Amino acid sequence: MKAILSRLFNHEELTRKEAKNLLLNITRGMYNDAQIAALLTVFQMRGIKVEELIGFREALLTTRIPIDFSAYTPIDIVGTGGDGKNTFNISTCACFIVAGAGYHVAKHGNYGATSVSGASNVIEQHGVKFTNNPDKLTRSMEECGMVYMHAQLFNPAMKSVGPVRKALQVRTIFNLLGPLVNPCLPAYQLLGVADLPQMRLYTNVFQKLGIGFAVVNNLDGYDEISLTDEFKVMTNRYETIYKPSELGFSLARQEELYGGNTPEEASKIFNNVLENKATKAQTDCVLINASFAIQAMEPAKPIEECVAIARESLESGKALNTLKKFVELNS
């Protein structure tokens, strides 16, 4: 570890193989918490390179419990987390709107590491019992178009760094890795990132991996489209900065997207959105993220049509019915 840290301090890059072996050693318990914290800190300060990130991804995928949903060509909708904004569960809400619109969603998530309520927290609040049983998950995909995979059941290696991540309370390379290690290797991905350098990083990674993608960033630092400012979208086909008004949305205020002080409060907001009882700012924020997820799967559709599809899923009750069926199947 000392030699690796020295190289990183000198701004040297690791090869894909070196990065893979480094993370495999961490998952095998070969380093203590102080060493892991030092490693996470130096990567946060100097930044991670494309080949390093792919190497880390390969390490975690080596140790994962795989599951095959390739027949469904699903999408995962996720943010890197760690943006410090403590928003409600926007990506997870968007998943149910997309599934309600008839698409297949394979959501991979975890408990909140730097926020009150991560995806696993809000899903668990509904009485869902996490599983890695392929038969149960396939039934959920078949009957409601939505699967939730709790990261710790599929990526047991992540447990070894959980306490360090919680103690640091800042974004780390594991926030960057989380969206890349969905155990079913989804065909599509909507990924929210907190800054423009991350957009470039992930765009390069997704292009090398051959994944259909949309990477989004609100220019005021949210790791999702928050509508609190202009936002940028990068896909296989285009790179554009949008103003919310260009797509028929109002500008939101940061406090309108607050996720609450407890998982219970976050769950209430989540339910309000899918019951179509939320505030306009909360609803619009979820709809716009769901819309770009739909376009990631159907790139020929203009974004205005994707917004209409997402809105119909919510306002018709299809998104809520998807949630109810999902809870019934997974409780």
UniProtKB/Swiss-Prot annotation:
It catalyses: N-(5-phospho-beta-D-ribosyl)anthranilate + diphosphate = 5-phospho-alpha-D-ribose 1-diphosphate + anthranilate. Anthranilate 1 binds at G79, N110. InterPro entries: Anthranilate_Pribosyl_Tfrase (IPR005940), Glycosyl_Trfase_fam3 (IPR000312), Glycosyl_Trfase_fam3_N_dom (IPR017459), Glycosyl_Trfase_fam3_N_dom_sf (IPR036320), Nuc_phospho_transferase (IPR035902). Its cofactor is Mg(2+). Anthranilate 2 binds at R165. It comes from the Bacteria. The keyword Transmembrane helix does not apply. Keywords: Amino-acid biosynthesis, Aromatic amino acid biosynthesis, Glycosyltransferase, Magnesium, Metal-binding, Transferase, Tryptophan biosynthesis. 5-phospho-alpha-D-ribose 1-diphosphate binds at residues 79, 82-83, 87, 89-92, 107-115, 119. Signal peptide: none annotated. Pathway: Amino-acid biosynthesis; L-tryptophan biosynthesis; L-tryptophan from chorismate: step 2/5. GO terms for biological process: L-tryptophan biosynthetic process. Mg(2+) 2 binds at D223, E224. Its EC number is 2.4.2.18. One of its GO terms (molecular function) is anthranilate phosphoribosyltransferase activity. Binds 2 magnesium ions per monomer. It is an enzyme of class 2 (transferase). Mg(2+) 1 binds at S91, E224. Pfam families: Glycos_trans_3N, Glycos_transf_3. Transmembrane segments: none annotated. Homodimer. Catalyzes the transfer of the phosphoribosyl group of 5-phosphorylribose-1-pyrophosphate (PRPP) to anthranilate to yield N-(5'-phosphoribosyl)-anthranilate (PRA). Belongs to the anthranilate phosphoribosyltransferase family. This is Anthranilate phosphoribosyltransferase. The lineage of its organism: Bacteria, Pseudomonadati, Bacteroidota, Bacteroidia, Bacteroidales. The gene is trpD.
